[in-house]
């Protein structure tokens, strides 16, 4: 018995040593762990680019500064790169980062040509999307001029009163004078004050002068700006000056946002929300009609009259018999995101719930909770959780970011698990950037982002990348849908449709769809690489 115990102890010790050896082997080339208190540590390797923004003004050049490397490291370096981390063995207690170099989807000659074309398209995009409202303006110190910092807006070819203009001059002067200058519009006054001289009414440059400061300020309250150049969404940087002082502020020139409202619906007795009137369930199916019928049957247990929209690109489509199902057929193998676009295009309700065709509704699939979140918060989309046959449920909460790269190389896309913060008022919900393939969203917002039909095989997070900075995304772990089991019992008959589905859904290593996706991301989003952890 004693020998058996000794053998057991020796075996445990041997396993422990082996584990430590594997840990050392996988981490000996990795950078050392950062200080727990540090948010960032400078990367090992080539020195970073000089930060020109830290250069002093000439009058302050003689003053020494001690640079705080940890804080400087938090600033954009405009020189991003993607590197895998965590060693070759996927140990559960080590941070794993997978990196993909999108440039590998091109040969050298093609990469040079496509990079030039991409940069040309990028510059054209900047010209279209930027306006003077994006220009940095610095307010001067101790200026006697009072003016609006922001919030001045006019519709194209319309006129407004300009609020907040005033001269707060402390010294007594014989004549108080101010000047206004614009580039996309003209100045005028809605009324004339006796004792104030106006020069340039109806012109881009207007001068106002008076020996009485109060009269000048009363006249400034009546100044109007008129948009004279039709541009649907731009800004005019205007100048406001007096003797020895000049300031600039922007006047936004754009149409006000046009609302897309949905009429309120009557509530069923005792219900908080009329789900059938508020929500349409959308799905994309391909060959798996047994799974699709199981999904529909599970939905009908809890929501018997909610509309279900199906986009179907199967080779031999089968009819679905249900009075509240809209079944739309597509060319065979048209694609995953193309089907999403078709399904969402037919939704007429305020919200659309996206589900996979192999999901199963249960008592925990409470759409009322997701509707409540969107009704009471500014979120545009909220995901739930998907429960596997093992009992494990995932929300697939993802934090997404794009870091600037060196000129001409493109940016770096970062993806990691997590969330930004909890959603106030909803204890099981958080704010994040990407969620699992089970979400409720505002229909008009999903349409504005859209699903790129060029992604026809495997895609999901690309939708959230397209919506990054536009879609406000949340996730709730207490609204759960089941995922049908993928386990194939050996005694069941072979399903030719399932084999065809697997070839399309899970492309092999030699399949070109993954390369095509990398080429698309390289050009479309001006990316050079991406990492996931």
Curated annotation (Swiss-Prot):
Keywords: Disulfide bond, Glycoprotein, Glycosyltransferase, Golgi apparatus, Lipid metabolism, Membrane, Signal-anchor, Sphingolipid metabolism, Transferase, Transmembrane, Transmembrane helix. Pathway: Sphingolipid metabolism. Disruption phenotype: No visible phenotype, excepting a slight decrease in neural conduction velocity from the tibial nerve to the somatosensory cortex. Mutant mice display impaired motor coordination and balance. Sciatic nerves from over three month old mutant mice show signs of Wallerian degeneration, with redundant myelin, degeneration of myelinated fibers, axon dysmyelination, and an apparent decrease in the diameter of myelinated axons. The distances between neurofilaments in myelinated axons from over 3 month old mice are shorter than normal. InterPro entries: Glyco_trans_2-like, GM2_synthase, Nucleotide-diphossugar_trans. One of its GO terms (biological process) is nerve development. It is an enzyme of class 2 (transferase). Residues 1-7 are cytoplasmic. The keyword Glycoprotein applies. Involved in the biosynthesis of gangliosides GM2, GD2 and GA2. Involved in the biosynthesis of gangliosides GM2, GD2, GT2 and GA2 from GM3, GD3, GT3 and GA3, respectively. This is Beta-1,4 N-acetylgalactosaminyltransferase 1. The gene is B4galnt1.
